[in-house]
């Protein structure tokens, strides 16, 4: 194990501990660590703090008693939190010796030091207690095999697997053994995701091992549910486009389905016009599925794919609607000249479908579809009448379907700028409508 960092990284864990003092849960962790000699900050948290980045959550290891440690930490956080703040939630997974503390301001994951073995490729690991070294060597990549002990006697030192600190300084992703991707093929998705997030590249041997694992159809040895969990993490990245593009470049998408593809430029165009109340993750997912729309039984193909990945029914159906209608919506938007025509083309569509159709139209001269999609997303979809069906009933219009048709005609005229402002003009337009 290495105890000091190479050039470009802190020589010891001093800066890590200083930064930890300022993070949610950090002071409480340091307080608990004073009472025992086995607590260390590890994994992504240690990696990010050494790089000078703020970690998404804090990862901690102890020799034993992860559940008890989590409960003690939860109590300490609750005691120092402002009044009326919700108490942290503690989740325990006894099989793996892990626990987590979640609260509004942060999250701490606690694990017992362990070694892992795999009965078969892709199987969940068999876990037993392990040493500091074994716990580091079980991890996915060397840059995540770094620990900063919090116990007073070791505080300020670093513990790292071979090559870990050098790889971190050089921006390299390296697996810790040759069977890593076969043991746990989700590491293929993590290789792309970490590379995209951190701007790191795969070390030469690791890149070859990844290619070999994909060629051996390693992803077929794990459940689609596990793939789906990793894909959702990629979709949640700050730069999800880069993460998905990396998955495509690595060959993961093609290994999952031959029709699955990702066009980063198209995706970025769609995100550029998607409003804040849209779902970027669903837009990106729909863009990935466009290749299935031309396939025989394309809707069923997409349904089975997303269902296998265990997306929620609501998200699954919204993505399928978006992917299926975006190409035809492009045709409708090309022909839409009046605001009312744009509105009618898009009114029943998802926001993601409008943005994706607009992105598809960006390659055309003058970009009429893109302009129409952007105009609807920004302004037209928010246009409302001041009147409603009760106003028409009060004016003597009989109840029935014509109420809706008259309101629609009035809305169209308002969208097209044919009405003066005010309820009276809208009511007059509705009453004059030819229905």
Protein language model regions, located:
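Catalytic cores of the polymerase beta-like nucleotidyltransferase superfamily
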Residues: 1-435
């Amino acid at each position: 194990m290495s105890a000091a960092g190479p050039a470009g990284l802190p020589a010891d864990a001093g800066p890590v501990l200083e930064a930890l003092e300022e993070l949610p849960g950090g002071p409480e962790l340091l307080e608990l660590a004073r009472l025992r000699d086995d607590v260390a900050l590890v994994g992504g948290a240690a990696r990010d703090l050494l790089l000078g980045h703020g970690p998404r959550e804090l990862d901690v290891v102890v020799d034993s008693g992860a559940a008890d440690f989590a409960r003690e930490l939860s109590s300490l956080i609750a005691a120092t939190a402002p009044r009326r703040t919700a108490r942290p939630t503690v989740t325990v997974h006894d099989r793996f010796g892990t626990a987590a503390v979640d609260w509004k301001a942060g999250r701490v994951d606690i694990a017992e030091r362990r070694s892992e073995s795999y009965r078969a490729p892709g199987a969940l690991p068999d876990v037993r207690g392990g040493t500091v070294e074994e716990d580091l060597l079980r991890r996915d990549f060397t840059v995540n095999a770094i620990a900063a002990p919090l116990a007073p006697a070791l505080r300020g030192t670093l513990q790292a697997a071979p090559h870990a600190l050098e790889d971190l300084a050089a921006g390299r992703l390296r697996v810790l053994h040759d069977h890593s991707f076969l043991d746990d093929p989700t590491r293929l998705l993590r290789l792309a995701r970490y590379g995209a997030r951190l701007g790191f590249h795969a070390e030469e041997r690791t890149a070859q091992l990844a290619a070999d694992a994909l060629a051996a159809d390693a992803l077929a040895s794990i459940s689609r549910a596990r793939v789906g969990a990793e894909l959702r993490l990629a979709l949640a990245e700050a730069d999800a486009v880069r993460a998905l593009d990396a998955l495509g470049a690595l060959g993961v998408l093609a290994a999952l389905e031959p029709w699955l593809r990702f066009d980063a430029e198209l995706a970025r165009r769609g995100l550029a016009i998607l409003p804040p109340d849209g779902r970027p993750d669903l837009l990106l997912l729909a863009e990935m599925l466009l290749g299935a729309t031309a396939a025989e039984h394309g809707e069923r193909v997409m349904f089975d794919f997303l269902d296998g990945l265990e997306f929620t029914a609501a998200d699954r159906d919204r993505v399928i609607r978006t992917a299926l209608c975006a190409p035809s919506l492009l045709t409708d938007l090309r022909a839409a000249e009046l605001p009312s025509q744009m509105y009618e083309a898009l009114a029943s569509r998802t926001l993601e479908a409008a943005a994706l159709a607009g992105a598809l139209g960006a390659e055309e001269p003058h970009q009429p579809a893109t302009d129409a999609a952007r105009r609807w997303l920004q302004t037209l979809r928010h246009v409302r009448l001041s009147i409603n069906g009760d106003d028409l009933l009060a004016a003597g219009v009989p109840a029935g379907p014509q109420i809706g048709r008259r309101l629609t005609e009035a809305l169209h005229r308002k969208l097209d700028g044919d009405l003066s402002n005010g309820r009276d003009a809208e009511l007059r337009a509705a009453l004059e409508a030819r229905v």
